[in-house]
Swiss-Prot record:
<feature type="binding site">
    <location>
        <position position="175"/>
    </location>
    <ligand>
        <name>S-adenosyl-L-methionine</name>
    </ligand>
</feature>
<keyword id="KW-0963">Cytoplasm</keyword>
<dbReference type="InterPro" id="IPR007536">
    <property type="entry name" value="16SrRNA_methylTrfase_J"/>
</dbReference>
<keyword id="KW-0698">rRNA processing</keyword>
<dbReference type="InterPro" id="IPR029063">
    <property type="entry name" value="SAM-dependent_MTases_sf"/>
</dbReference>
<keyword id="KW-0949">S-adenosyl-L-methionine</keyword>
<comment type="similarity">
    <text>Belongs to the methyltransferase superfamily. RsmJ family.</text>
</comment>
<protein>
    <recommendedName>
        <fullName>Ribosomal RNA small subunit methyltransferase J</fullName>
        <ecNumber>2.1.1.242</ecNumber>
    </recommendedName>
</protein>
<dbReference type="Pfam" id="PF04445">
    <property type="entry name" value="SAM_MT"/>
</dbReference>
<dbReference type="GO" id="GO:0008990">
    <property type="term" value="F:rRNA (guanine-N2-)-methyltransferase activity"/>
</dbReference>
<keyword id="KW-0808">Transferase</keyword>
<keyword id="KW-0489">Methyltransferase</keyword>
<feature type="binding site">
    <location>
        <begin position="104"/>
        <end position="105"/>
    </location>
    <ligand>
        <name>S-adenosyl-L-methionine</name>
    </ligand>
</feature>
<comment type="function">
    <text>Specifically methylates the guanosine in position 1516 of 16S rRNA.</text>
</comment>
<feature type="binding site">
    <location>
        <begin position="120"/>
        <end position="121"/>
    </location>
    <ligand>
        <name>S-adenosyl-L-methionine</name>
    </ligand>
</feature>
<dbReference type="GO" id="GO:0005737">
    <property type="term" value="C:cytoplasm"/>
</dbReference>
Length: 258
């Protein structure tokens, strides 16, 4: 697969563009492409663009939906918080988000006080996350939240397998990107179509689940469409249903005793 290029539209940010390209092994180009997909660094942020009908895709931890989640998100009572075990917890867990994507779930958990390690193998997604994290670190309303978020650009299976005992997270969160067979759902999420086209589907979910179970101290949480099939291999210890999504929980103690 050809690497997605990065075009710098703002000359004053060329050094930033070069750093992103070096960190994530992206080709830096001098002209905006006439077709296909590319990353574009402007004066405000890094975006994934295409010449088609899709809008710009970017990670965002400060404005828009992120601000709403930060201010009106529902606290520890919201489904993702319950899934990782925050409701009633005295000690907040260290969560490894093994499929970070655009970081939306990671941000929610960090907002609630968790220390979150975002692991992302796609160089495009990792670059978008790095840009969003840098912007969040500069903004006084999100600086403290961003301080609890760490980005790792790696294959999650390899990263999890290489952790020492002291580095093991309490919770591993997995949100696999499966081929979308629901046309209505796809039409409702046009911004994600371009993202999924570039990132690709997660075809090694069973192997990732096994690595997550081996690494997690307390539990593994798998986010799925409400009617989607569970990941093959291990039966969930419990299931937490939501309106459009559900969380399959793999509790380490229960798996060990079962």
């Amino acid at each position: 697969m050809t690497a997605t290029p990065l075009y710098c539209a703002e000359p004053a940010r060329l050094d930033t563009a070069r750093r992103l390209c070096e960190r994530f092994s992206l080709p830096l180009i001098k002209q905006r492409p006439a077709d296909g997909y590319w990353l574009e660094l402007g004066s405000e942020r890094l975006e994934l663009l295409t010449t088609g009908k899709h809008g710009a895709v970017y990670a965002e931890f400060v404005e828009g939906a992120a601000r709403h989640r930060r201010e009106q998100g529902g606290g520890r009572g919201q489904p993702v918080a319950k899934a990782v075990g925050l409701k009633g917890a005295k000690d907040l867990p260290h969560v490894a988000d093994a499929t970070a994507g655009l970081g939306r779930d990671s941000f929610v958990l960090a907002t609630l006080g968790c220390r979150v390690t975002m692991v992302e193998r796609s160089p495009v997604a990792a670059a978008l996350l790095a840009d969003a994290l840098e912007r969040a670190q500069r903004d006084e309303t999100t600086r403290d939240i961003a301080a609890r978020m760490t980005l790792v650009h790696a294959n999650s299976r390899n990263w999890l397998a290489g952790l020492t005992e002291a580095q093991r997270p309490d919770v591993v969160f997995v949100d696999p990107m499966f081929p979308d067979t629901d046309k209505k759902s796809a039409a409702a999420k046009k911004d994600m179509q371009a993202f999924q086209q570039v990132i690709g589907d997660d075809m090694d979910s069973a192997e990732l689940l096994a690595a997550a179970i081996a690494a997690a101290r307390v539990r593994v949480v798998v986010k799925r469409p409400r009617l989607g099939a569970a990941i093959a291999g291990v039966k969930p210890s419990a299931v937490l249903d939501g309106k459009s999504t559900r969380f399959d929980l793999y509790v380490i103690k229960a798996l060990a005793s079962g």
